[in-house]
């Protein structure tokens, strides 16, 4: 596995934009299927189990992660770890389920979620059609979950105290990370004086294509960095195309998302929709994308719609589109952004921005015809529901989504900008 440096920091840039004409369809992507065909359930008990047993009842449970990794699991099977117990090492999932019958890893019994700690990655998925749920993955040297396969679903986990909560490698595609708690993943994998190579502190790292990150809570992706002072991101995309980051609540991360790619690769067509982004960090930033003038760009056809952002730090930023920004680099619609510093930055021809609400000390971009600079009237610092009289009400245009972050219907006309529809 290659750990890619982030090559930051983008503070208050002056660079050039690329003209964006984004026609990306904004319909929510489908999740990887969950298993529908019944198979065998195997139990794992760290205290009373034995790998020599059948594993098919709690009384005959297996004991170790290695036993699970070596088992000939089939489509529709389930591996259940006993609640209140912990394992050290890597759970290796190399077999594959099918589109109609995933292999499931979960929990049984009562008490706290089963814990896996230590190891390079606490869970490593190289197979396809797995569902991993209800585990806590903590203190891993790299990732809570690393996915190299396809059509896998990670749901209902807690990943904390790792370099990255969930990492999807360059071979990983059509995976879903959903309804999980990715908390205080605040370790750096590279952190040394000089240069421009520090890396780490990610909630989710996407090096693959066509993945969905949705309905998660991502907090505390933040760490000290020799190169940048501080670093970290809720969702980092590097060499990943057509990923969808939607319906997430994020708090106190250094950056919500930053995009880049290696020479000869791409990070195109990524969509950010209906996310709530709050942070008290001084340099917190919502979104960073690059044009062709950057060695990490261009990040073509990036789309940000209906995000609500509140970053009160004096040097906090909304969106940054630099080194040749243009309408085919970044399209923004229906975003509500309040920051202590600059709300948006563009150079070059400029981003395709409209129907937004902005509040901040600086606005270094051309405001769209239906955008406005005004107080968004959020309910609170982290509760970004709009209050009565908010300029976001009725400002939004259709963006292809039928419900908001609360699951409330989005009307075909007169929608509220931001992640939440106004509810009188």
Regions found by a protein language model. Give the residues of each.
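Right-handed parallel beta-helix/beta-spiral solenoid domain characteristic of secreted/periplasmic
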Residues: 78-89, 93-143, 179, 369-376
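Extracellular beta-strand/beta-solenoid scaffold signature
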Residues: 92, 117-123, 139-146, 161-169, ...
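Consensus "Asn ladder" position of solenoid repeat domains
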Residues: 135, 152, 157, 175, ...
């Amino acid at each position: 596995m290659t750990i890619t440096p982030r090559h930051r920091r983008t503070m208050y840039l002056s660079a050039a934009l690329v003209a964006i004409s984004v026609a990306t369809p904004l319909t929510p992507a489908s999740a990887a299927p969950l298993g529908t065909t019944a198979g065998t359930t195997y139990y794992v008990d760290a205290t009373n189990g034995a790998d020599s047993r059948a594993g098919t009842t709690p009384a005959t449970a297996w004991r170790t992660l290695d036993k699970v990794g070596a088992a000939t699991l089939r489509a529709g099977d389930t591996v259940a770890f006993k609640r209140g117990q912990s394992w050290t090492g890597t759970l290796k999932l190399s077999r594959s389920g099918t589109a109609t019958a995933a292999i499931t890893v979960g929990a049984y019994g009562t008490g706290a979620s089963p814990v896996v700690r230590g190891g390079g990655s606490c869970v490593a998925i190289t197979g396809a059609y797995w569902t991993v749920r209800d585990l806590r993955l903590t203190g891993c040297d790299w990732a809570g979950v690393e996915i190299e396969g396809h059509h896998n679903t990670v749901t209902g986990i807690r990943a904390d105290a790792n370099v990255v909560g969930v990492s999807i490698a360059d071979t990983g595609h059509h995976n879903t990370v959903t309804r999980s708690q990715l908390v205080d993943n605040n370790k750096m994998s590279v952190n040394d004086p000089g240069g421009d190579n520090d890396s780490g502190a990610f909630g989710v790292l996407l090096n693959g294509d066509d993945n969905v990150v949705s309905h998660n809570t991502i907090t505390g992706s933040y760490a000290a960095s020799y190169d940048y002072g501080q670093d970290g991101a809720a969702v980092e995309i590097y060499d990943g195309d057509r990923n969808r980051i939607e319906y997430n609540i994020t708090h106190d991360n250094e950056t919500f998302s930053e995009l880049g790619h290696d020479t000869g690769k791409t990070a195109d067509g990524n969509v950010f929709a209906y996310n709530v982004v709050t942070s008290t960090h001084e340099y917190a930033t919502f979104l960073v994308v690059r044009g062709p003038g950057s060695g990490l760009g261009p990040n073509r056809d990036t789309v940000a719609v209906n995000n609500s952002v509140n970053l009160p730090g004096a040097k906090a930023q909304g969106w940054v589109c630099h080194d040749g920004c243009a309408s085919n680099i970044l399209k923004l619609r229906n975003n509500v952004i309040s920051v202590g510093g600059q709300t948006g930055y563009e150079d070059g021809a400029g981003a395709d921005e409209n129907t937004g609400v902005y509040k901040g000390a600086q606005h270094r971009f051309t405001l769209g015809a239906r955008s406005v600079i005004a107080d968004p009237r959020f309910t609170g610092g982290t509760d970004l529901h709009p209050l009565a009289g908010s300029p976001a009400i009725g400002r939004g245009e259709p963006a292809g989504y039928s419900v908001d972050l609360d699951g409330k219907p989005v009307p075909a006309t007169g929608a509220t900008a931001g992640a939440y529809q106004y509810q009188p």
